Amino acid sequence: MKQQKINVNSTPGFKVIKAWLASKKRKPFLFQQQTWEQVIAGNSGLVNAPTGYGKTYSVFLGSVINFINEYPKDFAAKKNNGLQLLWVTPLRALAKDIGRAMEEVITELGMQWRIGIRNGDTPISERQKQKTKMPEVLIITPESLHLLLAQKGYPDIFKQLKIIAVDEWHELLGSKRGVQVELAISRLVNLQKDSMVNSQWLMENNEKKKQQHINSAPQPINNSTIQPLNHFPSIWGISATIGNLDEARDVLLSSLNKEGIIIKASLDKKIEIASVIPDEIEKYPWAGHLGIKLAQKILPVIEHNKTTLIFINTRGMSEIWYQQLLTVSPELAGVLALHHGSIERELRTWVEEALHAGILKAVVCTSSLDLGVDFRPVETVVQVGSPKGVARFLQRAGRSGHQPDAVSKIYFLPTHSLELLEAAALKEAIAESFIESRQPLLLCFDVLMQYMCTLAISDGFYPDKIFKEIKSTFCFREILEEEWLQLLQFITAGGIALNQYDDFKKVEIIDGLYKITNRRIAMRHRMHIGTIVSDAMIKVKFLSSGFIGVIEEWFISRLNPGDVFTLAGRNLEFIMIKEMTVLVKKSNSKKSIVPSWMGGRLPLSANLGQMLRRKLNEASDNENFPEKEKELSALKPLFDLQKELSAVPKENELLIEHIETKDGFHLFVYPFEGRLVHEAMAALLAYRISKITPITFSFAMNDYGFELLSDQPIPVDDSNVYELFSEENLFADIQKAVNASEMARRKFRDIAVIGGLIFQGMPGEKVKQKHLQSSASLLFNVFAEYEPNNLLLRQAYNEVMYQQMDEVRLRNMLQRIQQSKIIITVPARLTPFCFPIKVDSMRENLTSEKLEDRVRRMQQQLDK
C-alpha cells in the first residue's frame, strides 16, 4: 500500500508547534518533521534517532498536531476528548519522566489534555478516575495494557484512539513482554475493523428500516451498543539503533498488514570513550578484583563533572562499589547514591528526583537506569566491567549529554586487565556502527494462553475471530490450527493430561463465546498478568521502622540470625523472618555478606565477540603491533607472555592449550563466543571425547573460552580435533550432553507460571520457591508421560536449545571453526589467557578472601 504524503508545514497544528518551539529558541529536527508528516497522514512506522534529540517529541507532537488540525479553532478549549494517544513504555521509571515532558508542552500550549500514567505504582483511586474518564494520553506498561483488556467493556476505552506509540521498542523486541505488546496491538487494530463492520451494518440496517417504515411513523433505532471507532489507529515504534531495524518495524506493524516506514535521523551523536588504564598490568589477570582497586582513579571524574552515573553489571557488585567509594572518599557522603531494582521504590524515586534536581554528584547503578530517562545534569558515565554488548554500551553512554549537540562521555573501567581488549573492540564496533540485532520470539504459547484467559475474563472471545488476529502477529504467524485447538482444549478442559482436575477448566463455552465466569479464577488471573518471572522476592524491613528493599528468598534461606549482609548501601543484621518479611537492624560490623542475585551474568554478544577476535588479530602481529591504541599498547606485556608460552590466535584461528598441573590435565579452548555458548560447547566436547575413551570431566568457562579438567590425559589432537568440533549430529549430541530434560524442567517453571498453570499466591502470601518448583516438576512429569506433545512442554525444550544454549550461535561457531586453522599448544605452565578461567573454576569452593590469597600465591609462582 502506498504511503500517503501531506505537507505538514501548511497545517494549523504545525504552525502552532513551530511557534511554540520558536518561543523556546528551538527548531524541529528534520526527522521530527518527517514523522509529523507521516503521523498526520495516518501512516505507521519506526523512529530511530540518537539519545537526547527528541524521539519522544517526534511522535507525541505528531499526535498534538493531529488534534489541532482536527479542531483548529477551539483545540485549546476542548476537554474530555477520550484517549487519543496510547504510549507503551517498558519501564515504570520512564513513565514519570515522559509524563513530565508531555505535561510541560500541553500546559504551555494552553490545551486541556490530561496526561495519565497507568502501571503497578498507580493508586487505585487514579485508576478508577481513568475508568470513568480516560485522559487524552495514557502512558502504560505492557502488563497494565493487558489489565485494561481484562476489563469488561474495554472497547469503549479505545474508541477515540488515534495513535499507539511503543517507546524503547528495541528493549521489548526479543522478549515475552514484546510478545504481549504484539498481541495487544492485534486486538486494538481489530477493534477498529469490528467497528467498521458494525458501522456498515448499521448504515445498511437503517436504510432497510427506512424502506420498511416509509409509509408509517419512524421508529427509533437502538444503536447504543454500537459505538464505531472514528479512525484506524496508526502505530509508531521509537527505537535506539539496533542491527535489524527493518525487522523490528515489521514485527511491530505485523497486525496492520500494510507497509510501514523507518524514519532515521541523519544526526551523529558524538561519543567520547576513554579507558581507565591500571598503573600496572597484571600478566595473570582474573575477574572481579581489579575494578575496586581502580576506584581511586574515578574520583577525579566525579569531581570534575556535575553528575556521574557509575554503571555496575550486578546488584551485588553495586553494593560493594557504593561502600568502596565512600571508604576512599568519605566526603561523597550525602552526594553519592545507590540505585538498583531491589531497593525500596520510595528510595529509588528519591534518587531519580535528586538526579533531576542536580543535587547528587554520583549514582552507583545497575541496568535500572539504562533506559531513556532524561537526567540532564548527568555529564559523564563510568562503565565498570564489560557491558557484554555494543548496544548496551551505547545505551549507557547516552545517559550522559542527554540533549541535542551535547557530547556523551563514557569511561570504561576494567575489572581485569584483559577487559581492556573489550574497550578497544567497543571503540571500533561503535565507529563502524556494528550493533547487535534483537531477534523476535516465535510461538510463545505460554504468553498466548495467558492472553486468551485475559480476553475470556473481560467480554469473552470467539475462537475463529481471535485466531485470525493472533495469526496476524509476527510471533504467531506460523501457528497451526491444530496447535490453536490444543490451546482451546487446554483452557476449557485441561487438555489430555489434566482433564480430571477442575482447576484447569478455567474457560466456559457459552453459545460459542469463550468466557471465564468464575470470579475466583478471574481475580487470580488479573493478579498475575505479565511475563516477568523472577525468584521469589522477600521484603526487608527494619525491626522498628520502614522498608529498605527486597532480597531473593534463596539468599535469605542461607542466613542465620546474627549474620550481617549489605542492602541499599547499609550493613544489616538478620534477626528473623516474620510473615514473609525479613526483619533486620543496623550493624556496625565491617564485614558483611553481599547478596548475589540470580541471573546476574550476561553473556558476551556475538558482535562484541567478533570484534574481540579482530583485535586479537592485530595483537598477534609482531611487526605491525598497534602501539597507538593505548588499550592494546598497555596489554603488550601480557600478549608477549602469551606468545612466549603459547600463542595469540588470529581472527581465522582457534587456540587450544593442553596444560598439566597438580590438579590434573587441562584442556583450554578460546572461541571468544560468550559464556552460554562456551558452557554448551564444553558439555558437547566432553560428551564427544567420552565416546572415544571412558573419561570424566569438570568444566569452567568465561566469555573468552572454556576448560575441561580430567585426571587423565585428554585425547584431543590434530587427528581428531576437526571431527570433535563438527556440526554433524549437533542436535542429538547436545541433547545427550547437557541433560536437556533437566534444563527443560527448570525452564518449565517460568512457562507454567506465565501460562497460568501455577498460582504464585496472594499479595503478601507468595508461594515459596521450592513449592513452585515442585508443582512445576510434577506437571512436567505428567505432561512428559501422558501428553508428550503438549505445547508448553515443547516450548520448554525449545527455550533451552534456542535461548539458553543459543543453538544457532553454537552452530555458527562450529561452522567458523571448520573454516579456521586450529592451533594446539602444550604450554609448560598456565598462560595469561587461561588464568582467569582457572580462577573462575576455584570460586565455588573458596570464600572471596581465601580465593584472593590463593590467586596471589599462584601469580607469584607463575611470575618466577
Identify what each model region corresponds to.
Residues K2-S10, K15-A19, K27-Q34, I40-Y53, ...:
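Helicase motor core with emphasis on the C-terminal RecA-like subdomain
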Residues V197, E204-E207, A217:
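Acidic, Ala/Val/Gly-enriched low-complexity intrinsically disordered segments
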Residues W201-L202, Q211-H213, P220, P228:
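Cationic, low-complexity basic patches in intrinsically disordered or flexible, solvent-exposed regions
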Residues F467-I470, F474-M537, I551-E552, P595-S596, ...:
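Extended, highly charged accessory segments
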Residues I532-S534, L559, T566:
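Short, well-ordered loop/turn sites that connect or cap secondary structure elements
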Residues S545-V564:
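A conserved acidic, glycine/proline-rich C-terminal tail/linker
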Residues R570-I577:
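Short beta-strand-centered aromatic/proline hotspots
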Residues K578-P595:
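Short, solvent-exposed secondary-structure boundary/capping segments
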